[in-house]
Amino acid sequence: MADYLISGGTSYVPDDGLTAQQLFNCGDGLTYNDFLILPGYIDFTADQVDLTSALTKKITLKTPLVSSPMDTVTEAGMAIAMALTGGIGFIHHNCTPEFQANEVRKVKKYEQGFITDPVVLSPKDRVRDVFEAKARHGFCGIPITDTGRMGSRLVGIISSRDIDFLKEEEHDRFLEEIMTKREDLVVAPAGITLKEANEILQRSKKGKLPIVNENDELVAIIARTDLKKNRDYPLASKDAKKQLLCGAAIGTHEDDKYRLDLLALAGVDVVVLDSSQGNSIFQINMIKYMKEKYPNLQVIGGNVVTAAQAKNLIDAGVDALRVGMGCGSICITQEVLACGRPQATAVYKVSEYARRFGVPVIADGGIQNVGHIAKALALGASTVMMGSLLAATTEAPGEYFFSDGIRLKKYRGMGSLDAMDKHLSSQNRYFSEADKIKVAQGVSGAVQDKGSIHKFVPYLIAGIQHSCQDIGAKSLTQVRAMMYSGELKFEKRTSSAQVEGGVHSLHSYEKRLF
């Protein structure tokens, strides 16, 4: 036993593992499966880990999760769910500009503090107009003013309780006959704070609280449903007006300037320039145009995988970079064009360069599980963009179908011929709009049902927090600081180590993640 003893106590600890710099300066292209993070010291619980992350220079999220602008991943339903759970969704642009802008508008109107542009009707409108508004907007608590517009005298409100039991032949009745009159309403004065208004709404037990000025003219309204959403989703991503954050994608062509104008009018918070290879004169010119016309709009450039690519977009003025080329589950760019880079190496190299200029990095692609998210964040990414991981959730576009008894949803790459045939925007992303023969850079497939975002994303959040706990970091900021200082250590995995790290040596098993 004495042969194993070393004098001098336990003060000596051998150097173990590789720093990120040592790991990625070996010349090999590494994916997330090619390495592990070595554990640290735990003196806190997982729920104490702060996942606050920068999406762009000016937008911060409470969770580092972003949904990809793909037509089988993100429309309004996904963007709303992502924002409510602390992330953000980017509405795809493989559609008309009008459709995309309307999807953004749905997100911005979903949860609000002071609603300054609500649906308003007049006393001479009819009951059928309320039902039409309910079908179009999903609610029927509608204020009634003299002229049917904001800024005119409030005379009443119409709610579901006023119309629920009306027969169809009564749908031509004027609203003034059945509305709740002004004298029966609880209102609040203009200038009141949101907190004070919410307290009045809670005490009144009403569904809506109109805000009026000294002339009794309607200037805003607050909804009880928004109070409930605030309670149920404390991490929700919101702007200064308490509206949900929403992003959208555009291309780099001249006609995308019209799309940009519609998105700006709809209230979009951040725009990503959607290109498979972002280091182009087209993207640089578009960045400069956007920054000049909409200086307060945050712009994400990409995709890039090298520091040289990143430099040109940073010089042009981007507020964040999207990193990844050919690493997505439905992407075949590396196979077809022989261009791209393994994702772990790309994220580390670009993040290490971009951080010097205060430009956050979004790791886009190659994410197969929550461990990959943790690794991307540990390599310098501020947020992680997900496509296949969120496809087939309830909130993703498309209908479920069954194959061999398994519930599936369609999922396709924006470089697939299927997506290119749907709309020109997908062709533009891959510089294929003028080609007589299309070269597919993606495939179409199907993904198994994952349930709702409202259950799946909390699982991802908990997984990231537990990963940070094992690392010994109380925040993602600390994780990155440990990585750049060399305190955080990594280790390469052989193919045998990867087998050992997965489920093995069982006759059968059930893998339930949450």
UniProtKB/Swiss-Prot annotation:
Main location: cytoplasm
A single GO BP: 'de novo' XMP biosynthetic process
Binding of NAD(+), residues: 274-276, 324-326
Cross-link (Glycyl lysine isopeptide (Lys-Gly) (interchain with G-Cter in SUMO2)): 195, 208, 438
Modified residues (Phosphoserine): 122, 160, 416
InterPro entries: Aldolase_TIM, CBS_dom, IMP_DH, IMP_DH/GMP_Rdtase_CS, IMP_DH_GMPRt
UniProt KW Nucleus keyword: yes
NCBIfam families: IMP_dehydrog
Protein name as annotated: Inosine-5'-monophosphate dehydrogenase 2
Primary gene name: IMPDH2
